[in-house]
Amino acid sequence: MRKRQFLLVAATAMGLNPAQAQQNLQADRVGLLVLHGKNPGGPRDPNIRSFALRFEREGMLVELPDMPWSSRRYIDGHWDRAMEEMDRHVATLRSRGATRIVLMGHSLGCPAALAYAVRKPDVDAAVLLAPGHIPRGYYEFANLTPVRKSIDEARAMVAAGKGDERAAFNDINQGRSLTVRLTARDYLSYFDPLSDAEMGVSAARVSASIPVLTVIGSADPLFRLAKSYVHDKLPPNPRSRYLEVTADHLTTPEVARDQVVAWMVQALARV
């Protein structure tokens, strides 16, 4: 009952017909694939875990897996492996009874959500919370040159036929320098500005039928960039929204939680 009351209030706030919203709730089972941020992120990160559990308490089906960029796995294999893992998690949600699939990414989970939506356009919506991981920015912005050097090094290794050799490469997460060991080919799958791990690349390729909510916090390092870097590259969809909240990179999911639920009611409403 609490779930229906909450979502019906949200439907009313969004100007939707409450009776129609209730009918939709009875007909649909929403499955959420929640994708955490990059190392030190992971499924136990309280900033995303409490957010995901709220949706579970509302009666939705939730998967919050340990992805290849977590603190435990950082970074485990090629970007394609991450997409394959997401495929299995979506299949799990469907096997549990989900009839609608929503991808929710935080930080690096955002480019993963976009890339998956490009490959699997049968998802119903995507939520980008504090979008992070910017291969084009890593390559072009003067303060991120250590990553550019690693991208050039990895490209040279691939060109020399050494793409499957492991090496130490640079990464930067929220201003913190990181070192990651993986093959040059796998590194480029995450960091090449032309790869689909680059949000600007994937956003433009998302099906126009998929509504996307982009949420950015006022204290996020990408606050002034997120709209033009990601959201404005999405194809037009009348249900897509861009939302600014008073939060930093880590607290954005929790701060935006109720607004995300309200948007989902609108985005998933059947016409």
At which residue positions do the language-model features occur?
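Alpha/beta-hydrolase active-site loop
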Residues: 76-95
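N-terminal export signals
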Residues: 5-22
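Short, surface-exposed "cap/lid" segments of acyl-processing enzymes
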Residues: 27, 32-55, 67
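Conserved alpha/beta-hydrolase "acid-adjacent" motif
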Residues: 221-227, 252
